[in-house]
Curated annotation (Swiss-Prot):
UniProt KW keywords: DNA damage, DNA repair
Similarity section: Belongs to the DNA mismatch repair MutL/HexB family.
Pfam families on file: DNA_mis_repair, HATPase_c_3, MutL_C
Protein name: DNA mismatch repair protein MutL
Length: 608
């Protein structure tokens, strides 16, 4: 016989609500900091112990609460921010449900101390597992202090799902970074077991981004402003060259609230398409302001997801704002210092590829020009027209290079790739070859990446990845989470060829990098590896994650995008491919080559 329906006790409903709002220590900190910001705080201090499992303490200088309000704040759905259902259409605060504090109190031992500015004394309330144990007067500065101890002490099922103290501290750091970027007018500090995780002073947004993400990252950002159709968009976005391997540096805010929204992310990625490699993500700090009635923030317990009333308008306006800035390519030299073509005879290219050509120009011009017959013999190609303006350039189609004569057959047996007859390059990105009645198209970046990965893997399995000390060590300023990862995984980074030395705060000195990557962007490679290590988890799993890290190094060690190759270089690459395992794909799983048969071509041209 089924049990009868009964109303759950309040202590159980509070625990259920806590399961929706309080996922881990970082979510506790998010909810409490939002309350501090709503209370007008301009200085917020966070202290955690054991990643927040043992202690979370938040101190602010906000308006504070009276004795009556402090007690009411521990009741479910008690709030000062809304009074009627009409207020839900005009929410201007970060919190409004009145759920966070009672939910946190129900699964922890909580101590709340608060004092209003004009009050002679404060109020201290001690709560254990949702039950008020003591209420008394206390002496304190104006503001509020909330201490949360032994989170989930009465819900062991939730406690066992928490990660290590270091991992939880990392989540806390990420949360504070998002909050700090949202309010550059507020000072934030955070310590973990007595060690500073974050300390930022009040200032403008660019200064805050420099403090939170590092000066190098901030230097790659470009300011954005647009007002259209009742939507205000402002913030900073990075050049395509400063992109990351994850979305961890994409900070998007709606009316001051950090969100993760597929519509917003899609608009950003659409704007960057064609100027950024696949699988890469820009650094952005974007603030979108629109009337509160145009967005519903009451659709998810964590408020990270929202619903727009005019979704398409928000998407298209944001994409348009980003594209207008990207089209101007502010990271490139201005007209008085025109960008030189990557090589003699380079074709006219669209604005979308201008940045990629400029990045490859220096490396291309530095290549040796010694005669090494047979060389590519190509017909003359049009030069870029400096009169073309951004957005109006057309894409020129290259004329097919005249194929050179094949070499004399080698005495030793050749592998598949070495035996291919080279036709030439297409768009300086793909190698065209012939094998019998087949046209073989090879992605030169994917092939180079596979060869480099094979070398790194062999080095790792024998004497370790070959390292090269830098003649001039680089100083690299990291975000606090990146610095924490570098500290925790120092031994693992050394095994793959890196030497990083602490230099105070979140700054490290790069003394050595893998020899294969010596000519590449060391700082970008290190940031990508730190992001990869953060996602992969504990160092005990390092051997399992070895290939992912080595493939990241391989990707950075070879040419990307448009790059002119001589015949000698192509033959060396093809020979290297014959000596690799899994030569059909790059380490990330993308295909290296594609075959088009003569029969397929004849069908395309209706000759069969």
């Amino acid at each position: 016989m089924s049990q009868r329906i009964a109303i759950l006790p309040e202590i159980i409903t509070n625990k259920i609500a806590a399961g929706e709002v309080v996922e881990r220590p970082a979510s506790v900190i998010k909810e409490l900091i939002e309350n501090s910001l709503d209370a007008g705080a301009t200085d917020i201090s966070v202290e955690i112990a054991a990643g927040g499992r043992r202690l979370i303490r938040i101190t602010d200088n906000g308006h504070g609460m009276s004795r009556e309000d402090a007690l009411l704040s521990l009741e479910r759905h008690a709030t000062s921010k809304i009074r009627s259902d009409n207020d839900l259409d005009g929410i201007h605060t970060l919190g409004f449900r009145g759920e966070a504090l009672p939910s946190v109190a129900s699964v922890s031992r909580l101590r709340l101390s608060s004092r209003e500015t004009d009050s002679p004394e404060g109020t201290e309330i001690i709560v254990e597992g949702g039950k008020v144990r003591d209420v008394r007067a206390c002496g304190m500065a104006p503001g509020t202090v909330i201490s949360v101890e032994q989170i989930f002490f009465n819900t062991p099922a939730r406690l066992k799902f928490l990660r290590s103290a270091e991992t939880e501290a990392g989540h806390v750091g990420d949360c504070l970074t998002r909050m700090a970027i949202s309010r550059p007018d507020v000072a934030f500090s955070c310590s973990s077991d007595g060690r500073d995780l974050l300390r930022v002073q009040r200032g403008d947004l660019l200064r805050r981004l420099s403090q939170a993400l590092g000066k190098g990252t901030a230097a790659s950002l470009h300011e954005l402003h647009l007002s259209r159709d009742g939507i205000d968009i402002s913030g900073y976005i990075s050049s395509p060259a400063a992109c990351r391997s994850t979305t961890s540096a994409m900070f998007t805010y709606i009316n001051g609230r950090f969100i993760r929204d597929k519509v917003i992310q899609h608009a950003i990625m659409q704007a960057y398409r064609g100027v950024m490699d696949r699988g890469r993500y820009p650094v952005v700090a974007l603030f979108i302001q629109l009337p509160p009635a145009e967005v519903d923030v009451n659709v998810h317990p964590t408020k990270h997801e929202v619903r727009f009333r005019r979704q398409s308008l928000v998407h298209d306006t944001l994409q348009s704002a980003l594209e207008e800035l990207l089209k101007r390519s502010p990271w490139l030299p201005r007209p008085q210092t025109p960008v030189q073509p990557a090589a003699v005879g380079a074709p006219s290219i669209s604005q979308a590829y201008r940045e990629r050509v400029a990045a490859a120009a220096q490396a291309s011009l530095a290549m040796a020009r010694k005669p090494d017959p047979p060389r590519f013999h190509e017909t003359a190609r049009p030069q870029p027209d400096p009169r073309h303006t951004p957005g109006t350039e057309s894409v020129s189609v290259r004329e097919a290079p005249t194929p050179f004569l094949p070499r004399e057959p080698a005495a030793d047996p050749q592998g598949y790739f070495s035996a291919l007859r080279i036709i030439g390059q297409f768009h300086d990105e793909y190698i065209l070859c012939q094998s019998g009645d087949q046209l073989v198209i090879i992605d030169q970046h994917a092939a180079s990446e596979r060869v480099a990965f094979q070398k790194l893997r062999h080095q790792f399995d024998t004497d370790g990845v070959e390292s090269q000390r830098l003649l001039f060590p680089e100083t690299l300023e990291l975000s606090f989470s990146e610095a924490d990862t570098a500290r925790r995984f120092g031994n693992e980074l050394a095994r793959i060829g890196f030497e990083l030395e602490p230099f105070g705060g979140n700054t490290v000195i790069v003394s050595a990098i893998p020899r294969l990557a010596i000519a590449r962007d060391a700082s970008g490679l290190i940031r990508d590896l730190l992001a990869e290590l953060t996602q992969l988890g504990a160092s005990s799993a390092f051997l399992d994650s070895r290939d992912a890290l080595l493939s990241r190094i391989a990707c950075h060690s070879v040419v990307r995008g448009v790059h002119r190759l001589e015949e000698r270089q192509i033959r060396e690459l093809l020979h290297g491919m014959d000596g690799t395992d899994f030569a059909a794909s790059c380490p990330h799983g993308r295909p290296v080559s594609h075959v088009i048969t003569l029969g397929e071509l004849e069908r395309i041209f209706k000759r069969t």
